[in-house]
A protein has these predicted regions:
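Extracellular loop and loop/strand-boundary signature of outer-membrane beta-barrel proteins
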Residues: 47-48, 88-92, 125-129, 165-167, ...
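Signature for the C-terminal beta-barrel architecture of outer-membrane proteins
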Residues: 30-42, 52-56, 66-74, 108-113, ...
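Cleavable N-terminal export/targeting peptides
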Residues: 1-32, 293, 320-321
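Beta-barrel outer-membrane channel/assembly domains of diderm bacteria
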Residues: 24-115, 142-150, 154, 184, ...
Length: 321
């Protein structure tokens, strides 16, 4: 299996002194680090109208070293060969891609968190208008929890190369900047507003979520490219319901949305999860648990964008220690 990781010597030279500082408590002395890890395995069938069907697999590996209750070093290793793709295809030359895409130091307290290094593209939940959850940003993120269920996030760094093999190639990317304000209004309403600069473009993003009931949430998301007359909009709902078969009830989760992406929106549109194309589109996904004991899940998803349609179906297994 091919495993390519670029040199990260400069990053380690910066992170290691911070690890040494974090690993020492003035009152308790040296603290023993704790290692944890998680592995997600997915196998899926991908049938797209504009090309032959294929069978794919994905591995996501999350190792983490907790230095103290606040400090940790984290990494992320995944299959696939570009920013928004994390699947390898059986029976082709692209069956053995496996790359480390992140390596970062995190400090987290009740007041917020700071991440430094090759960091995730998200601070928590991944929005439909956000960057792919398998992507990366080289830089620093700071999230500050404010009063009344509000928070502000600032990310400063670099982002340009979308090849997973170049994720650790520091210093050759364009500037990346993001500032985001998020808030909850009671138990049912929440919103986010952000400004982003990336890939030689500037973007304003807004998101509103409304909790319909205990199970279902409706949302609307808009990203406007401010230096061009182009936008992306997503309107949808997510939640869960109970299906019955053979006198047995099965909880099923769903996710459905309509979207529109201008053809002139730019490269940012291609950096979302499983990008299918620009224009009018929609998606409907159902998922559930096959085995709680063994942490096995199933999913079925149908996507349509203009004249292109896609059907995805598969299973996912998780292991954690």
């Amino acid at each position: 299996m091919l495993f390519r990781v670029k040199q990260v010597r400069n990053l380690f030279l910066f992170i290691l002194p911070l690890i040494a500082i974090a690993g020492f408590d003035a009152n308790a002395g040296q603290i023993t680090p704790t290692f944890s890890q998680k592995l997600d395995i997915q196998v899926r069938y991908d049938n797209r109208s504009n090309r032959p069907s294929r069978e794919q697999y994905r591995l996501r590996y999350y190792p983490s070293l907790a230095i103290t209750s606040a400090w940790s070093v984290n990494s992320f290793v995944v299959t696939g060969d570009d920013f928004s793709s994390s699947h390898n295809t059986f029976g082709t030359d692209s069956t053995d891609y496996l790359y480390a895409r992140r390596l970062y130091l995190r400090h987290e307290t009740e007041l917020g968190k700071t991440e430094l290094g090759i960091i995730p593209t998200y601070k928590g939940r991944v929005s439909s208008t956000g960057l792919s959850k398998d992507g990366w940003i080289t830089g620093i993120r700071h999230v500050r929890q404010l009063q009344n269920d509000t928070a502000i996030e600032i990310v400063v760094g670099q982002l340009a190369n979308d090849q997973a093999s170049e994720a650790f190639n520091i210093g050759s990317e364009d500037e990346y900047f993001e500032v985001e304000y998020s808030a909850k209004m009671g138990q049912r309403h929440s919103y986010e507003a952000s400004f982003e600069r990336m890939l030689s473009g500037t973007f304003a993003r807004a998101e509103y979520r409304f909790r319909l009931n205990n199970e279902d949430t409706a949302f609307i998301e808009l990203v406007q490219r401010t230096d061009e007359s182009a936008a992306k909009i997503v309107v949808g709902t997510s939640g869960a319901f109970t299906a019955s078969a053979f006198n047995t009830s099965y909880p099923v989760e769903y996710f459905a949305y309509y979207s529109y992406i201008d053809s002139s929106f730019g490269t940012r549109a291609e950096l979302i999860e499983d990008f299918l194309g620009t224009g009018h589109g929609g998606s409907l996904e159902f998922s559930g648990v096959l085995s709680q004991k063994h942490d096995v899940e199933w999913f079925v998803r149908a996507d349509v964008v203009d004249s292109v349609s896609r059907l995805l179906a598969g299973i996912k297994l998780s292991f954690e220690s």
